[in-house]
Every structure is written in C-alpha cells, then in structure tokens.
UniProtKB/Swiss-Prot annotation:
UniProt similarity note: Belongs to the WD repeat striatin family.
Residue ranges with Polar residues bias: 337-346
Protein name in the entry: Striatin homolog
Any one annotated GO CC term: membrane
Source organism per UniProt: Dictyostelium discoideum
Coiled coil (UniProt feature): 37-109
GO BP terms, alphabetized: regulation of signal transduction
Assembly and interaction partners: Part of the core of STRIPAK complexes.
Xref: SUPFAM superfamilies: WD40 repeat-like (SSF50978)
Gene behind this protein: strn
Length: 827
C-alpha cells in the first residue's frame, strides 16, 4: 500500500512538472531577464551619455575659465602699460610747460641798454607816411603807440631837407582836408537834386560844380604823373592813385583825389537802398509761390508764376529807369563830345531789351513744356478708346490756321486787349509790358484750350459713340489687364519633419499656420519673407511651434465665432489622436529665438470623446459658436465651441462603413446645409437644422467595402463663394462640377495623371486650383473649364506628393504643402 501511494505521488508530481511546462517557465524567465537586461543596458547607456555630457561641460567650463583668466591678466598688463605711458606723458608735458613759461618770462624782460634802430632811407620814408596818417586822423587805427615812442628820437635826428618837405606836405594836407569838407557838402546837395530830377523826368543832367571841374581840368593839364583816374559808367571817378607829392602840384592833386573819392558815396547809398527794396519784393513773391505750390493746383501755380513775373518786371523796370537816367546823363555828355557814341548806346539798349523779352518768352515756354510733360508722362494717364473717326472730326472743325473754331475764343480775344491797355497805361515802358503780359496769358490759356478742345470733341459724339468709350491705363500696356495672374515660386519653408497636411492664412494679419504629420503645428510670419540685399530668398524660422497632439495632425480651421477677420484669434486642430484642440494664436511680434525652449499656455480647450477614430476634416460655421468635424468612424459631428459639448452626429444612410472624407458649406444656403463626400464617391446634402439628408448629388460605387481598390473616393469637396456650385477632386483623377439647384453633374474632366488630393477656389471666384500626387499644381478657369497654368512642385515620397493647397483671401499669396515636409509659397 505504501508503495502504491508513493507511485501515485510521483505520478502526480510528474503531472505538475512536465518537460514542456519547465521549458516554458525557463523561456519566460529568460525573456524577463533579457528585457530587464535590455533596460539595464539602456539605462547604463543613458548614464554613460550623461556622464560624458557632464564631463564635456566641465571641460568646456574649465576652458572658458582659463580663457577668461588669460583675458583678465592681459587687461591688467595693458592697464599697467597705459598708466606708465600716461605718467611719462604728464611729466614731459610739465617740463615743456615750465620751459615755455621760462621763455615767455625772458621775452617779457626788456634790456635796459637797447640800441636805437639804424638810420636809413626806409626808416625816413616810413616816418613820413606815419606822420601823414596821424594828421589825416588814422593814428589810432594803423599807427601803434609803441611805434610812435620808438621813432621819436629818430624823428629829431632827420635832415633839414626832409623836415622842409614834411612841413610843405603838412600844409597841403591841412588845405585838402578843409577843401574836402566844403566839396562833400556841395556834392551831397547836387546829388540830391540829381536824384529827384531823374526819378520825375528824364531831363539832361546838370553840369558839375565849378570847383570840381576847375580842379580836374587843372590837374589834367599840369602833369599826368600827379593823379590817374578811371571813370565809371555813371561818369564818376571810381578809383584814384596818388603819386608821391611834389612841391608844385601837391595841392591840386590832393584836392582832385579827395573830390573823386567823395562823389560816389551818395550814389552808392541810393543804389544800395534800391537793391534792398528789389530783393524784398522778390523774396515776398517767392514766399507766395512756395505757399501756393503746396496745394499742387495747376491754376494757382500759374497765377503765382504770373505774380512772380510781374514783380520781377517791376523790379527790372525800376532798375531800368535808374540805368536809363544814368545812361541819358552819359549820352548827353558824350553827345557833346562824339555823336557816334549816341547811336552805339541806343543799339546797346535795344539789344538788352530784346534779350530780356527772349528770356521771358523762354521762361513761359519752359512752364508750358513742364506741364505738358507732366500730363503726357504721368503713370495714371487714361486713354480714350473707341472714338472712331476722331481725326476726321478734328479736320472738319479746324480753322485755316490749325486751331479749333470754338465760340469761347472770340470773347476771350476781345476781352484781352482791354486788360492789356489798362496795364500798359500804368507802366512806364509800354512795349515790354505788353509782350510780357501776352506771353503770360498764352501760357495760362494753354490748359483751358486743351480742356475746351477735349469737351468739343466729346460733345460732337453721339450716344452710341459714347457707349463705346472705355477708359484704360496706358501704363499697363494695352489689353493685358484682363489676363489671369501668373504664379511664380518665391519661397520655401523647411521646418517640418514630415508631410504637411493643412495650411491656413490669416485674413487680416501676416500669419500662416501649418499642420503636419510630425505631431506639430507651426505659426509663420509672412513679413519675414520680404527679400533683403543680403539674401533675396531668406530662410525663415516659425514664430512658434505648437505641440500637444500625440499623432499626426490632419486638419486645422480658424475659429469664426464672430465672422470678422479681426476676431480670428484662435484656431482648431485635429488628427490621428481623435481629439479636437483649440489654440490661441501667438502674436506676430514675438521673437522666435527668445521663445525657443519655452512652453507657453496656448491651449484653450479640448473636445474629447466625440469620435472613435482619426479626424479628417474640420469646418467652422461663420457667426456661430459651432464646429463641424468628419471622422474615420463614419460620423460627422457638430460641436458647441463655448461649452465643448457634442450636439449631434450625422452619418451615411447605408451605415457607418461609409467614411466621410471632406465637408463644405454652400455659400448660397446661409450655412443651413452641409455637403459631405464619402470614400465610396457619394455626395450627400444634409440639413443642419433637421439633421436629415435632403438629397444625394452622386451615387457611390458598389465596392465600398474594399477601400484599397476603390478609385472613386472623393478626397476634397469645395463650394463656390457666390454661386450654387460645388466641385470635387477624387482618386480617379477627375474634377467634377455640380449644380446645387438641380443636384446634377454639370461638367467632369480628367485633370491630373494621378489622384487629386486637394482643391481651393480663388477669392474672386473665377479660378480653381487643384493638386495631385503627380507633383503638379494646376490652375483652372471655372467658366471655360480650361487649364491656365501648370506648375511642378514638391518631390514625391512613398507614392504621395502634394497634400494641401490654399489661396490667401486678401493678398497675392498661394501656398502648398507636400509629403516632402516643405511648404512652398507662390506669388
């Protein structure tokens, strides 16, 4: 019995520990050990890396410390050297200053026994000149007191002959000074009389005073060496050169020189006063011209030019009257001597008048040329087209002299002579003023004549001709203004690490956001794309990188709760992690380098629990706090963004196996209907108020369960911003146009050589752009359904190329995001 019990126990023990169980147990334990070992190895590697990093940082800090110590020592040494240099320089400067002070003290000391200057002819002549100047009253200005005391002893030792000559010259200088006072008084009276006579009448000039005439005649008859005078154009002596005095003719020469010096003074004073008056008049006219030119008006500018011309004419007439009076004095004198000089002076006056008139005419013609050039070469000048036989119309209404026969010109011509006669009677020189005023009136009338001819030409046209008139800007070069825009590549943004799935432009601010498969959202500043001198195509970094999703981000959308551009201060994003997140928009003024490594609280809300699979598309309903989302779980959900609640869900009539790929709101339905495209190629129109299917625009294919072989899947659906028109891009390379009123297909065309991934409509509603996985972007005219431009963009990656495209709503930007993780900006 005992043996049997032992055998049963062994059998039971063998049944518990069988060979396979033991092997499984050992394998499991071995796997656990290997996993732990792998963890240990990874932790060891991390620790070794950390140790290496800390050691490298320690070495780096030591090198920095050593470098800083070297710099401190170098600066201390340099400071010591500078101090030594400054001390040595200060000592040298003190020594130099002491030497200079000693030299100045030695120079100031005058020796007691100073030798008098040697006698010579130069000293005697200098002494004579100094005594002349003392007696004439220039002692304080020219002769210094030190020189007077210096030569007192020398003046006592001069010879008797020189003293006699000095006494004679002293007597003559006293006499000349007395004569000068009388002559100045006489000349001042005579000049006052001459000025009054020249301003009132043009009578011949009175004869000069008898004293001056006799003195000049005697001086010229006696000797030519005593005085040499040069006559001015006005008949007065301008410069006198005094020769060394002699005993016989000293008195006559001194009197003539003094009279010649005293005569031009009152004439100079009068000419200076006239010159000041003329300059003040001209400055006033210039001020009025500058104040009037600030308005940039043609008529006011011409009026100011006339005033400037008249003021210059008056100033010139004043100068001409003075010059004519002086010329008449000269001619009266010259006529007594030579009759030929009179004819020469008249010819000179005529030539001067002709030059003045030609200058004024050129001035007025210059003004006309300026305004003609301004009107002819202005960039915004509009040309009239469709006038028909305008040349024949001109020929019929042209006169014999080539001018248009207008009724207003005769009245203007009759009124102008009265103004001319009235103005000419007030002026002294009648001929010149008439010509000036006629030239100014012709220049001012050029603009009015041009406007009158234009009005007459338009008045001669009929209503049918006026209907054909079109305004065109000639600077743009003809009929090319209606041509479509040509997009050119400008910039590429390379900051993402995986394919770019969504792009959104801010309507008002220069901001763009991009969502990528690298689990991030980047915010870009478009102002950084402006080219500079250093780099015409700068590589910019994003303002901020938003991280929060745990998977690829497929879509993004602005928060349009108020529907205004200024309120687009937050946006939504969704993707593979089935969560919709709301983010606040970073400001465009932040510095991307200062914010590097910082985590800022831009996340506002999260919408969790609404979907059971990835979210493909988001759509914000304008002017409402509602958001639509389409998911791979087969539902379209409506969310309240203020409370983060899911209001309801929409699904295909055939079940949840039909996955919505894209959604759009028809602009003509006041945001009450929803277009939804599915992976089987069907399109449904939902009513958002009743949550019911209104109509089915397109039937889906039968093989909807086999999604891998389904070529009819619609990847993008868009709605026209102004018309009841919807457009779709699908896997079968087609773009289809649907009429929302009749719910029928209007047009279908094969647009690309590969599946179409996205569509976008121009803000004007005239063009649509499409992108496909054949690496091409094509722009289409909606009315003619023709391709306008084809661009090759983005490199393919794993049978994918371009994921998304977007127009800027206000500015001339176009962006595309591809599988190569690059955003390309077109302009």
């Amino acid at each position: 019995m005992d043996n049997q019990n032992n055998n049963n126990a062994l059998a039971n023990g063998d049944s518990q520990f069988t060979m396979p169980k033991v092997i499984d147990y050992l394998q499991n334990e071995w796997l656990k050990f290997e996993v732990d070992r792998a963890h240990w190895i990874s932790e060891k590697a991390e620790l070794t890396n950390r140790i290496l990093k800390l050691e490298s940082e320690r070495k780096l800090f030591e090198s920095h410390k050593f470098d800083l110590c070297r710099r401190v020592k170098m600066l201390e040494y340099a400071l010591q050297q500078e101090r030594l240099k400054n001390n040595s320089l200060l000592q040298q400067q003190q020594k130099v200053i002491e030497k200079v002070e000693e030299e100045e003290e030695e120079d100031d000391k005058i020796p007691k026994n100073r030798e008098p200057p040697k006698k010579s002819k130069d000293n005697t002549t200098r002494l004579i000149i100094r005594k002349y100047l003392r007696e004439m009253g220039y002692n304080d200005l020219i002769v210094s007191k030190s020189l007077q005391t210096e030569f007192e002893n020398d003046s006592q030792n001069i010879d008797n002959d020189t003293t006699n000559t000095i006494d004679d010259t002293n007597d003559t200088t006293v006499k000349t000074i007395l004569n000068l006072k009388d002559i100045n008084n006489n000349n001042s009276n005579n000049n006052n009389k001459n000025q009054t006579t020249t301003t009132t009448t043009t009578s011949p000039s009175p004869s000069p005073s008898p004293s001056t005439s006799t003195s000049t005649s005697t001086s010229s008859n006696k000797t030519d060496n005593t005085t040499t005078t040069t006559t001015n154009g006005n008949g007065y002596n301008s410069n006198t050169i005094i020769s060394p005095p002699s005993s016989s003719s000293s008195s006559s020469s001194s009197s003539s020189s003094s009279s010649s010096q005293s005569q031009p003074q009152p004439q100079l004073q009068s000419s200076l006063s006239e010159l000041i008056n003329n300059t003040t008049d001209l400055s006033q006219s210039l001020d009025s011209l500058s104040s009037a030119s600030s308005g940039y008006e043609y008529d006011s500018l011409l009026d100011n030019l006339k005033q400037l011309d008249n003021s210059s004419v008056s100033s010139n007439s004043g100068n001409n009257s003075i010059n004519s009076s002086s010329d008449s004095l000269d001619t009266s004198k010259q006529s007594q001597e030579d009759p030929n000089n009179v004819t020469i002076s008249k010819q000179q006056q005529q030539e001067q008048q002709q030059q003045q008139e030609s200058d004024e005419q050129s001035f007025n013609s210059f003004n006309e040329d300026i305004f003609n050039k301004l009107t002819a070469n202005s960039k915004g000048r509009m040309k009239i087209k469709g006038l028909g036989n305008l040349k024949n119309y001109k020929k019929e209404h042209m006169g014999e002299e080539g001018n248009l026969s207008l009724p207003d010109q005769n009245t203007e011509e009759k009124s102008t002579p009265t103004t001319k006669s009235s103005s000419s009677s007030s002026s002294s020189s009648t001929g010149s003023t008439r010509k000036k005023k006629s030239s100014s009136s012709s220049s001012s009338g050029s603009s009015s004549s041009n406007s009158n001819t234009m009005n007459s030409e338009l008045m001669g046209l009929g209503a049918s001709d006026l209907n054909d008139i079109t305004l065109d800007d000639g600077s743009k070069g003809g009929n090319d203004s209606a041509a479509p825009r040509v997009w050119k590549f400008k910039h590429s943004l390379k900051s993402h690490f995986d394919g770019v799935r969504s792009i959104q432009f801010h309507p008002n601010e220069p901001i763009m956001i991009s969502a990528s498969e690298d689990n991030s959202i980047k915010v870009w500043n478009l102002n950084h794309l402006v080219p500079t001198k250093k780099s015409p195509s700068p590589e910019i970094e994003p303002l901020y990188t938003i991280r929060g999703h745990t998977g690829p981000v497929f879509t993004s959308e602005w928060n349009q709760i108020n529907g205004e551009y200024s309120n687009y201060q937050s946006f939504f994003s969704a993707g593979y992690d089935m969560i919709i997140r709301q983010w606040s928009l970073p400001s465009s003024d932040i510095d991307s380098y200062l914010q590097h490594g910082k985590i800022l609280p831009y996340l506002e809300k999260e919408f969790i629990g609404g979907h059971q699979d990835g979210i493909w598309d988001l759509l914000s309903i304008p002017n409402t706090p509602n958001l639509l989302s389409s998911s791979a779980d087969g539902t379209v959900s409506l969310w309240n963004t203020t409370t983060s609640e899911q209001l309801y869900t929409l699904q295909h009539s055939n079940g949840l196996s039909y996955i919505p790929t894209s959604i759009a709101l028809p602009a003509t339905e006041n945001n009450r209907k929803l277009l939804t495209s599915y992976n089987d190629g069907s399109i449904l129109l939902f009513d958002l108020e009743t949550q019911q299917i209104i109509s089915q625009l397109k039937q889906g294919s039968s093989n909807n369960n086999n999604n891998n072989n389904n070529n009819s899947q619609i990847n993008k659906i868009v709605s026209h911003p102004f018309m009841p028109l919807a457009m779709t891009g699908s896997e079968d390379h087609k773009i289809e146009f649907f009429d929302l009123n009749s719910n029928t297909v209007v047009h279908s065309m094969i647009a690309h050589s590969n599946s179409i991934s996205s569509l976008t409509i121009d803000p004007s509603g005239l063009y649509i752009a499409s992108c496909a996985h054949d690496s091409s972007i094509r722009f289409w005219d909606i009315s003619s359904k023709t391709c306008i431009q084809d661009l090759n963009s983005h490199r393919p990656k794993y049978d994918e190329s371009i994921h998304c495209i977007k127009y800027h709503p206000n500015k001339g930007y176009f962006a595309s995001g591809g599988a190569d993780s690059v955003i390309r900006i077109l302009n």
